[in-house]
């Protein structure tokens, strides 16, 4: 499995990447919306883990662009914005799941695997 992690907090990103690597998951890092667009232009991903607040824009804008282009890649929002309104907004705009920070790596992994299994069953 290959995933794209769109996250600008370096220590958090390193922890997620290390956790997934132990399970054999390849995790590419994009620290900005622009870097995520560039990565997606040259690589197909099984899933995207997406922060909302990024240095060059909103992860929600990237999500809207993906869904507007018909991209059905599973997207799990991983963000400190964890109010009910934040979760509902992201889910309404096409996110497949939402996990607030702080989080447990095991839950992130379980949710991600569930999304990929669900997409594979379509």
Q: Predicted segment positions?
A:
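N-terminal/domain-start alpha-helical segments
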Residues: 1-122
């Amino acid at each position: 499995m290959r995933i794209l992690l769109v996250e600008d907090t370096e220590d958090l990103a390193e922890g997620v990447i290390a956790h997934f690597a132990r399970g054999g998951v390849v995790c590419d890092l994009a620290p900005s919306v622009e870097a995520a667009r560039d990565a997606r232009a040259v690589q197909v991903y099984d899933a995207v883990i997406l922060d909302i607040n990024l240095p060059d824009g909103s992860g929600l804008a990237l999500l809207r662009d993906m869904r507007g282009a018909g991209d059905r890649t599973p997207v799990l929002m991983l963000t400190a914005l964890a109010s009910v309104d934040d979760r509902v907004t992201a889910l309404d705009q096409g996110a497949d799941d939402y996990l607030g920070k702080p989080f447990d790596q095991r839950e992130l992994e379980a949710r991600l695997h569930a999304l990929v299994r669900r997409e594979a069953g379509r």
